[in-house]
Regions:
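Conserved ATP-binding subdomain of kinase catalytic cores across diverse folds
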Residues: 39-138
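Regulatory N- and C-terminal appendages and interdomain linkers associated
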Residues: 1-39
């Protein structure tokens, strides 16, 4: 029995719950694993750091949701999501950040859509929808 990394709901043999997928897009019925390992994500974050408009200590990537292909894609510009992979020195950082946001929401704070997605090495990557971006694209 699996638990959805977006909603924490039980989801049987599926990777994500229907509710979790609908939080990302009403058009999603499945979501492929992110096409990068945690290590590859950290490398991409290093190479793209000068492009990213959001700074900070944690490695992060800009991404967009491609609903036609049921996957999250790393992009240089126009991303609607920020991805944060597993950290080399601080294990389970994405899980910690997701739980912190969930607790903030439970006490009544407004938080953007967030959760975790599976990567190709079966690690979890934290995602959060950018609240400073508006428009039609996911």
């Amino acid at each position: 029995m699996n638990r959805c990394p977006i909603t924490y709901e039980l989801c049987g043999d599926d990777r994500y719950s229907s509710k979790g997928l609908k939080l990302l897009s009403t058009r999603l019925t499945s979501l492929d694993d992110l096409g990068y390992t945690a290590e590859e994500q950290r490398q991409e974050a290093f190479y793209r750091a000068y492009i990213m408009s959001v700074q900070g200590v944690q490695p992060k990537l800009s991404a967009r949701l491609n609903t036609m292909e049921s996957r999250m894609e790393i992009v240089d510009t126009g991303g609607r999501y920020i991805l944060k992979p597993q950290h080399d020195y601080f294990p389970e950082m994405p899980q910690n950040e997701d739980l912190t946001m969930r607790l903030a929401e439970m006490v009544g704070l407004n938080v953007p859509t967030h959760g975790m997605i599976w990567s190709k090495d079966k690690s979890l990557t934290y995602f959060i929808k950018r609240f400073d971006r508006k428009g039609q694209n996911e």
